[in-house]
From Swiss-Prot:
Transmembrane portions of the chain: none
NCBIfam families, A to Z: rplV_bact
GO CC entries: chloroplast; large ribosomal subunit
Protein name, as recorded: Large ribosomal subunit protein uL22c
Localisation per UniProt entry: Plastid, Chloroplast
Gene3D superfamilies hit by this protein: Ribosomal protein L22/L17
Top-level taxonomy: Eukaryota, Viridiplantae, Streptophyta, Embryophyta, Tracheophyta
Keywords from the UniProt entry: Chloroplast, Plastid, Ribonucleoprotein, Ribosomal protein, RNA-binding, rRNA-binding
Gene name of the record: rpl22
Pfam families tied to this protein: Ribosomal_L22
Main localisation: plastid
Function: This protein binds specifically to 23S rRNA. The globular domain of the protein is located near the polypeptide exit tunnel on the outside of the subunit, while an extended beta-hairpin is found that lines the wall of the exit tunnel in the center of the 70S ribosome.
Protein family (similarity comment): Belongs to the universal ribosomal protein uL22 family.
Amino acid sequence: MITKRKKKSYTSVYALGQYISMSAHKARRVIDQIRGRSYEEALMILELMPYRGCYPIFKLVYSAAANASHNKGFKETNLVISKAEVNQGNTVKKLKPRARGRSYPIKRSTCHITIVLEDISFYQQYEEYLMYLKKPGCSNENRNLTCYDTYSSGGLWDKK
C-alpha cells in the first residue's frame, strides 16, 4: 500500500472535528457559506445564522484560529478559511420501543468536519517582494532573462 506523506505547510493550520452528531448535508449547508471568507467574517456569519449546525462549526473555526496563534504565531486578522470539508461519519443505530412489543429503528448520522486556515500575510509579503524586483531601479542579476521562441529564432522550422 502506498501512503502519501503530508508536506509540512508553513502558512496553514487546521482543526478537525470528528463524530459530530449532525448529518453531513446539514453541515455542508453551513460550511458552504463560510468557505473562502476571512476568519472574523466567518465568525460573524456563524453567529447570525439560525441553523443548529452553526455552533459546532463555530467552535471548530475558533479552535483552528487558536491553533494558528498559539502554534505558529499567526495574527487572527490575516487568517482566511482556505479549505472546509465535511465527510460522512458513522451512523449510530438504536431501537425505539413502541407499543405491543415492537420497536422502530433510529439512525443518528454523524459527520467529520475539517477546517483549514491560511495566513495571507505571507502571500502579501511575497507579492511585495516580486513588485520590488520588477522595479526599474532594482539591480537584480537574474532580471534580464530572455525567452527564446522557436518561431522567431528560425531554429527547427526552416527545414522541411
